[in-house]
Amino acid sequence: MVLGKRHGSLIKRTTSMKMITLDTPTIYDASQPSDHLTFHQHPHNPMVVMASNYDDFLKTCSLCNRSLCHHRDIYMYRGNNAFCSLECREKQIKLDEKKAKTGFVTSKKPIRI
C-alpha cells in the first residue's frame, strides 16, 4: 500500500468557466486628455472616507473615556473597542463575561404560566 495515493472515483471537470464573463479594462490613449481620474488622483477616494469613519472609535477609551494618544499603545477588543490600557481592556472583558454568564443563567429558569 502506497501512502498518499487514493484510489477511487475521479472528479469530472465541468464547463462552468465558460459562463463567467470577464470585464477587460479599457485602455486610454495617454496623448489625449481624459476626464477619468486614476485611483490616486480622485479627490473623494472611498478608502479614505471609510478610514475616517472608522477612526472615531480610536479617539477615546471604550471604558474610561480617556483620550487615546497617537504615540501610545492602543488595546483592542472585539473589533471596534479601543482601550487606553490593558487593565481597561480586561475590565471590559470581565464585564462582558459576567453579562453573558448572568444572561445564560436567567435563561435556564423555567417559565411559569
Curated annotation (Swiss-Prot):
Give residue ranges of zinc fingers (FLZ-type): 56-100
Fetch the InterPro entries from UniProt. Answer: Zf-FLZ_dom
**What cystine pairs are annotated?**
none
Q: Does the keyword Ribosomal protein apply?
A: no
Taxonomy, superkingdom: Eukaryota
GO annotation terms (biological process)? defense response to insect; response to insect; response to starvation
- Explain the induction of this protein: Up-regulated in response to mild as well as prolonged energy depletion.
Q: Which UniProt keywords apply?
A: Cytoplasm, Metal-binding, Nucleus, Plant defense, Zinc, Zinc-finger
What the record says about disrupting the gene is: Promoted M.persicae aphid population development.
**Would the keyword Cytoplasm turn up in this protein's UniProt record?**
yes
Assigned GO CC terms: cytoplasm; cytosol; nucleus
Which cell locations does it reside in?
Nucleus; Cytoplasm
Annotated GO molecular function terms are: kinase binding; zinc ion binding
State the remark under miscellaneous: Overexpression of FLZ4/IRM1 rendered plants shorter which creates mechanical resistance to M.persicae aphid attack.
The record's section on PANTHER family has: FCS-LIKE ZINC FINGER 5, PROTEIN INCREASED RESISTANCE TO MYZUS PERSICAE 1
Q: What does this protein do?
A: May act as an adapter to facilitate the interaction of SnRK1 complex with effector proteins, conferring tissue- and stimulus-type specific differences in the SnRK1 regulation pathway.
In the record, the note on similarity to other proteins reads: Belongs to the FLZ family.
- Quaternary structure? Interacts with KIN10 and KIN11 via its FLZ-type zinc finger domain. Interacts with KINB3 via its N-terminal part. Interacts with GEBP.
Identify this protein by name. Protein INCREASED RESISTANCE TO MYZUS PERSICAE 1
